[in-house]
Amino acid sequence: MSIESIKAREILDSRGNPTLEVEVWTSEGMFSAKVPSGASTGIHEAFELRDGDKSRYFGYGVLNAIVNVNNLISPTLKGMRVDNQKAIDDKMIELDGTKNKSKLGSNAIVGVSMAVARAAASIKGVPLYRYISQLAGNSNIRLPVPCFNVINGGKHAGNRLPFQEFMLVPIGAPKFKEALRYGSEVYHSLKEIIKERYGLDATNVGDEGGFAPNLTSPEEALTLLVDAINHSGYQDVIKIGIDSAASEFWNPKTSKYDMDFKNIGSSHLKSSLNSGEQLMSRYLEILKKYPIAFFEDPFGEDDWENHGKITAAIGNKIQIIGDDLLCTNPERIKKAISEKTVNSLLLKINQIGTLTETIEAAKLAKEAGWGCLVSHRSGETDDHFIADLVVGLGTGEIKSGAPCRFERLSKYNRLMKIEEELEKLHRSNGNSFEYAGEEFYHF
């Protein structure tokens, strides 16, 4: 089955910002994908093309990216077989001709790449996750541990919390469906605790469905999570993940971290400025007091030294995950492997721009013995591509926000459906699969 045409249109994401929906048309029908977008983005990510026309959507329109899909990518890929993913992705990279996909826009390229994969899975008569597993050469089909972002801070919320995400990680659940139930129950317990301590208006939610009460310190947020976990009776099965998104409060010129960066004028207050060593000490204290599963982006996106130090200190106990540090970029991943900078990769398909490169990044992580956490973006749609991606790659962990807001739940609900399909296959022909559980960081 060959590509007949490709069309893109402008739609809105979960933050009300423009993004692309891409349609790949073939003789067998139309296959589409919707493109996510981040708020806290790394400077080393593939380039997301925006129009810059302040008279439309404050400059965030994507009409130029749409033109690139319709007028450049479509005629170039016309006639190519949809089941030749690498050739299609390579052709788009060649057509773009830049190191960071800034000519066509990563948002244009990734939408096509995702839609092509859906078309190929259809002609092969297999679910998307099975097709991705074939592309990746992965036979270890398993359901991931979900990481629910239930307290929002950083750039995702209007409070003064410096760290961006505080997550529930139900590693002790027996299956994905139960992990989702555990997360939902703790989420509702947390809502009641926040309402009791901070008032009803403190239960408003942030970009990813998590609560954003007026907290000022990470320890306040962690104590709330522990109380909610204990109240729900899951103290032995749920751990906590933290995404500091430290690049947002790191000054690379001074190498200082402003823990009160959202308080206007705080940059002049010495008490809020931390050195890398001071921030490291805080992480170590947090690890002593709370049931931590991982730290994501604990330091700035080019602070290789302190990432390496924290990995050397506690990398044998928990995951140290690189997001802004690595940007799903194979070259940066190779450097981090060589220098032992982190021990896990955050995998975002739109950070690098094609499915082929995403699979390559995951393979590098696997070969290095790293963990690999598949991730959504803060600006999401109802597209659940990453649910099939995480199962197909078998990475064992996914984060898609809180168990709230449909653009988040679409991924979790898709994973429940996949689990049901795999259970049915297991009963009928013995096909094996598993829930990652406590082995979530090994794949």
Swiss-Prot record:
Mg(2+) binds at residues 243, 296, 323. Mg(2+) is required for catalysis and for stabilizing the dimer. The active site is at 208 (proton donor), 348 (proton acceptor). Its cofactor is Mg(2+). Substrate binds at residues 156, 165, 296, 323, 375-378, 399. Disulfide bonds: none annotated. It catalyses: (2R)-2-phosphoglycerate = phosphoenolpyruvate + H2O. InterPro entries: Enolase, Enolase-like_C_sf, Enolase-like_N, Enolase_C, Enolase_CS, Enolase_N. Homodimer. This is Enolase B. It comes from Dictyostelium discoideum.
